[in-house]
Structure formats: structure tokens, C-alpha cells
A protein has these predicted regions:
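Donor-sugar nucleotide-binding helix/loop cap in glycosyltransferases
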Residues: 173-419
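Conserved beta3 VAIK motif of the Hanks protein kinase fold
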Residues: 96
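Active-site metal-binding core of divalent-cation-utilizing nuclease and nuclease-like domains
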Residues: 4-9, 17, 21-92, 108
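Conserved protein-kinase N-lobe ATP-binding Lys motif
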Residues: 100-102
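Mixed-charge intrinsically disordered linker/loop segments at interdomain junctions
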Residues: 144-191
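Nucleic-acid nuclease catalytic cores
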Residues: 104-112, 118-157
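Short amphipathic alpha-helical segments and helix-helix/interface helices
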Residues: 116, 139-140, 230, 381
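A short, highly charged nucleic-acid-interacting micro-segment common to nuclease
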Residues: 1-14, 368-373
Length: 419
């Protein structure tokens, strides 16, 4: 029998994650492990190796069903892991419950199956991952009956697919929807709004529409950081960035129509972009019509709507000049999973500092700018500033003072007039 340390629950979960969510360049895959696995020690006297924590990162506390699965993610799984070949056009939401050897040498396989079954009320597929040697025929029969996939982990950390689940159609709750958001082209997981001026993103569909080569057009007229502009344009849903090359979305096409209506040609529109190079003035003030278009584009970005809605609610509750710390504390109460994914870096160190093993917020850590996710507190905030939504631009994490960094709406509304 494998030792408790070699097939403890974190070891089992890390092996299962490598099988379900291998490290690839897939753009529509993302997974988080529960915050309990960010602890230094799992079994008494047996620390979790750093490499295992690194494999399990990032960490978050995501509620699915009546509890918090050990691992939750989104990915198109291969046919060997499912009882059907595919699941429509969207990758399924997957929940995993792991069980390993305890300090007494036992494995509660049945509990893992039942916990995974509970996640099926909101996930599309659920698995339990357990040491293969601990699985009985009755365990497998129960998993089949409850439509729970079963992954058997061997002493050499290979994976045996013992039972495959059928995909079920569930509407994901708000917390699970955050994981879907991170797995989409608009998620901020391991990517970046690399540029902090919206003109660089608005120009990308224009460059595609131009007869000349896209990268050359963008570099000549707008910005030389072509890859960063392309990534940001995809985040804002202006383009669909596929391996075969980017194409213009419906929203991006509207940007092109807007430019043609005002300038009659793409070349004429791009010549105006040259005048804005190096400008630090608010885009909304320098070019009001483009500022309004930016506002429309950035409002379609899911994170914007939630941030603005919660800032408005904070204003109504008397928090009229919220700091970054105030905002993150507030958001974590109402949208905990979203808050961590959007505002906190995905590294093991940052998540471990900000969240305890139960997923509760360690507020003291929020006063250190280094724990924050730059694409949100710097680039996204700058875009919201240029669009006329926020009063101040963002700052890079190493220059950030979270206590004095304000997130004020430009035009907060009076609540009684909305009723």
C-alpha cells in the first residue's frame, strides 16, 4: 500500500488536476483548488511539498451545491474522461472531490462519491479522485449509480479512469460563473491588459479591416506593442482571437462603422489615432465621441458592470470615497469568488496571504499593493478612467498604496431618484 504521505489528499488532487487540466495553451480552460490546500501541512508532521502547492494553485473558495469542492474548473475534456464525446459549444463546469490516505491509513471513498454527487446540482460533471488500491466494486457501483466519475490514483501518480460521468445541463450560480468568466477570452487569469489606454484596443478591429497587414498598420499608426493590443482587444470582445488569426466580432464591427461614419475611411480614422500617441489626458475629454464609444465597449465587459453596480451601492450606503481596500472588502462579502479572481494575483503566495484555509479574507494583507492583480488595479482602472466612469486612473502594484487608492464613480446617482 502506498504511504499516507505519497497519496495524501493534496497529492491525489494534484495528480487528478494534471489529468483533467493539463498545462496547455488552451484559452478556454481554467481551474482553482480550494483554499484549504494552501496550508503548509496536511497530515500531522507531513508538510505539503511546495511543488504540490504550485501544481494546485491558484486557490479560491468556490461554493458549488451545498459545499466547496476541492477543485473546480472549466475545460473541454477528452472522450476518455466522459461517457459522451462532447458537450455542445461550451466547455463543462467540472467539480472534483479528492480523498487520500489519512494518518490512520484509511480512505473514505464513499464520502468522496457522495460529496461529488452533491456538486452535480450546479456542475456539469463531477469526479472523485482516490487512491486506486482503496476502491472496491461497491464504490464503483455507487459512483455509476450517482453519475460520478472516478479517477484512481496509483502509487506512481498515474491516473486510471475507473468510471466516466455523463454531462448534465445545469445553470451555473454566480460563484461558478466566475470560473467560466476566467476560462473565457475575457478572463484575467494568467493574462493581462498590457496597455492602459483604450485607443490601443479600439484600433485593433480597424487594423484588421485595413487592406494592409494588421500588425504593420497598428505599429505604424497606433502602438508598437501589437501582441498586447491584440490580447486586450480580445478581452474587450472586439476581436475573436483564434489560432488561425483574429477576426472582428459584432462589437468590433460597430467600432469600424463608427470610424467610417465620422472619417469616411479607415486610413483617415487611424491618422487621428496618431495624434493621441503619448497623451496622458483623459480620452473622454480629448475625444468625447471616442470616449463615449469606449464607455459602451468597456460596459459590455462583465467585470465593469459588477464593479460599477457595487460602487453605486457603496455610495448609497455612505461610502462615498472608497479606497481599494474598502472596495475589495465590500466585494468579497457579496461576490467572494469574483473578487479574488479579479483583484488578487493568482500566485500561491498572494492567495495564501489574502485568504485563510477557510476562504475568509485576511484584511491586513490587502494593505500591501503587491498582492493585487495588475490588469485590474492598473490597466482596467485606467480604461475606466479614460471612459469617464472612474475619477482616477490606476497604479502599478509596486507603486500602489491600497489605503489611499480611491475608486470613485464620476457620476454616482441619488438612490431615491431611481425608485
Amino acid at each position: 500500500m502506498a504511504s499516507a504521505a505519497s497519496l495524501s489528499e493534496p497529492q491525489v488532487l494534484a495528480t487528478a488536476k494534471r489529468r483533467l487540466f493539463p498545462e496547455t495553451d488552451e484559452s478556454d480552460a481554467y481551474a482553482v483548488a480550494d483554499t484549504q490546500f494552501a496550508t503548509d501541512e496536511w497530515l500531522p508532521g507531513q508538510p505539503i511539498p511546495d511543488r504540490i502547492r504550485a501544481q494546485l494553485a491558484p486557490f479560491n473558495h468556490v461554493r458549488i451545491g451545498s459545499g466547496y469542492p476541492d477543485l473546480v474548473g472549466v475545460r473541454q475534456l477528452d472522450s476518455s474522461l466522459l461517457a459522451v464525446d462532447r458537450f455542445g459549444d461550451h466547455p463543462p463546469l467540472i467539480a472534483v472531490e479528492a480523498k487520500g490516505y489519512t494518518e490512520h491509513g484509511s480512505v473514505d471513498v464513499e464520502r468522496g462519491i457522495v460529496q461529488a454527487y452533491d456538486r452535480l446540482h450546479e456542475a456539469n460533471a463531477a469526479y472523485t479522485a482516490v487512491p486506486a488500491a482503496a476502491v472496491s466494486q461497491s464504490n464503483r457501483a455507487l459512483a455509476r449509480e450517482l453519475n460520478v466519475g472516478m479517477l484512481g490514483i496509483t502509487p506512481d501518480h498515474s491516473v486510471e479512469v475507473l468510471e466516466t460521468p455523463r454531462i448534465v445541463g445545469n445553470r451555473a450560480p454566480d460563484e461558478a460563473a466566475t470560473i467560466r468568466f476566467q476560462a473565457s477570452a475575457q478572463g484575467v487569469a494568467d493574462k493581462s491588459f498590457g496597455l492602459n489606454h483604450p485607443k490601443n484596443y479600439l484600433a485593433y478591429p480597424l487594423a484588421i479591416y485595413h487592406e494592409a497587414e494588421t500588425a504593420e498598420v497598428l505599429a505604424d499608426h497606433v502602438v508598437r506593442a501589437v501582441d498586447a493590443a491584440r490580447t486586450g482587444a480580445a478581452f474587450l470582445n472586439l476581436i475573436d482571437d483564434q489560432p488561425s488569426g483574429p477576426t472582428v466580432t459584432a462589437l468590433g464591427a460597430e467600432v469600424i462603422r463608427f470610424a467610417l461614419q465620422r472619417y469616411k475611411s479607415v486610413d483617415a480614422a487611424l491618422s487621428v489615432f496618431e495624434d493621441w500617441q503619448g497623451s496622458r489626458s483623459r480620452f473622454y475629454d480629448v475625444a468625447p465621441e471616442w470616449g463615449l464609444l469606449t464607455r459602451r465597449v468597456v460596459w459590455a465587459y462583465p467585470a465593469t458592470q459588477l464593479i460599477v453596480s457595487e460602487l453605486q451601492t457603496m455610495h448609497e450606503d455612505g461610502i462615498t470615497t472608497p479606497s481599494l481596500v474598502d472596495l475589495v472588502e465590500w466585494l468579497h462579502v457579496h461576490h467572494p469568488t469574483f473578487t479574488i479572481e479579479l483583484f488578487i494575483r493568482g500566485t500561491d503566495d498572494a492567495r495564501q496571504r489574502v485568504l485563510d484555509v477557510d476562504g475568509d479574507l485576511r484584511v491586513d494583507a490587502l494593505y500591501d499593493g503587491e498582492v493585487y492583480h495588475s490588469p485590474t488595479v492598473f490597466q482596467l482602472k485606467a480604461i475606466l478612467y479614460h471612459a469617464g466612469i472612474l475619477q482616477t486612473r490606476g497604479a502599478e502594484p509596486h507603486r500602489l498604496d491600497p489605503e489611499t487608492e480611491k475608486w470613485n464613480l464620476c457620476n454616482p446617482l441619488t438612490a431615491r431618484r431611481l425608485e
